[in-house]
Each structure stands twice: as C-alpha cells, then as structure tokens.
Amino acid sequence: MTVSVVVPVKDEAENVAALAREIAAALKAEPAHEILFVDDGSTDGTAAALAALKKEIPHFRPLRHDRNLGQSRGIRTGVRAATGEIIVTLDGDGQNDPADIPALLKTLRADPELGLVSGVRVKRKDTASRRVASRLGNRFRDAMLRDGAADTGCGLKVFYRDAFLDLPYFNHMHRYLIALVQREGWKVAYVPVNHRPRLAGRSKYTNLGRMLVSVTDLLGVRWLQRRHGGRTKIEEL
C-alpha cells in the first residue's frame, strides 16, 4: 500500500526543509510513498521554501490554501489530495520525530481491525504550563468521551485514508480523531514516540485558546458518539 505523509503548516519557513528531509529519510524502506505539505495561508516564506523542496525530494507535493483555515482543514486537504491508502500525519514544528513513523506503520499493518495508531509522547519537551494544561484537559475529555485516549495532543498518527474520509468533518476535528475513529467501529492502538523541542519559531496555540474551543467541541463529539451505530458489512444480493 502507498503511504502518504500529510503535514499541515502555518508560518513554518524555518522548519519545513529540515522536517521534510527527515520524513524522506524515514520512508526509505517504503517503496511507494509521497510527502504532502499543506501551507495553511502562511504569511512568511513557507510557500517559497516548500516550492524549492520539490526539486530536492522525490514524491514531494506542496499544497497551499489561499487563506488560513486551520489545522484540521489542512489535514483534510492533504488527505483528500493523497493517493495513498495509508495516511501519516505529524505536526509541522519538528516536535514529532519522523524516525518513529515505521513503528506506527508496522503496528497498523499487523491488525486489520485497527483504524488508527496514535503516538504517545515520552518525556515531553513542552513548557510546564502546557503540560499541566494538557493533563487537566485530558482528564476532562476522558470524563466526557470515554475514548481511552492515551495522548490526545500527539500529532503523529497513522490511519487509513478511507476511514478518515468517513468521519464527520468540523473545525478542530483533528483533536478528536481517536473518538471519531472508534465511533466508526475501528480499534485504536498506541505506540510510544519521541518528543523534541520545537525546531524554530513559536507555537500558534495558547492554553486559553485551546480551552475555549474545547468545551463546545467536546459537547459536539459527545453528541456524535450517541448517534451512530458503527461499521457494518454490506452485501449485494
């Protein structure tokens, strides 16, 4: 199966080249693969940096939104444009380690009942305030969704393209992929992964900003959980 790596980025001109090269190195054992970076309306030199990488990295496909639409839309744009049956996503700031991709792919391929494999960050390199906010947010989320998510904020995930496109789309949906995939009747597995300091630049998110949107999103996902019966086998008679 072809593997498509999808990386949404916003104002990451200093990070994209190094990250793209690391991803290409991690995929050397994959005979059929492609790398898609989705520039979500950057206002720095991200678009130019991505265009330059087309000459350097085989199977590299940069895409660009004409305005900022958010991380979930960036992922969805990449998945819809992808030709691979298996999708890998990771954040564009370099904190996810591409060297962990093969382990997640191996786990997904080992069990046909799995729809998604998520990384679980070990020894996180975030600030203390972000770690505390994440811990509290995860507890509240688990109380609401009961999805057993081991690390909701890890951007490194592997899943089937068709499974993703079956999910209801909404802004910030990338934070709830585990619950949404389970809602469709798939199993989810977890793999410990490395976590690194940001390569360059600053985060686009704040703890308060995440909290404000999370309450509404959690209520929406809980509503969705109660109104779906999961996968079914369809037979033509």
Name each model-derived stretch:
Residues E14-A18, D44-L53:
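Acidic helix N-cap motif at the loop->helix transition within catalytic regions
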Residues I87:
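Short aromatic/hydrophobic "clamp" motif used to bind/position activated sugar donors
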Residues T2-S4, E34:
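Cell-envelope/extracellular polymer assembly enzymes that use nucleotide-activated donors
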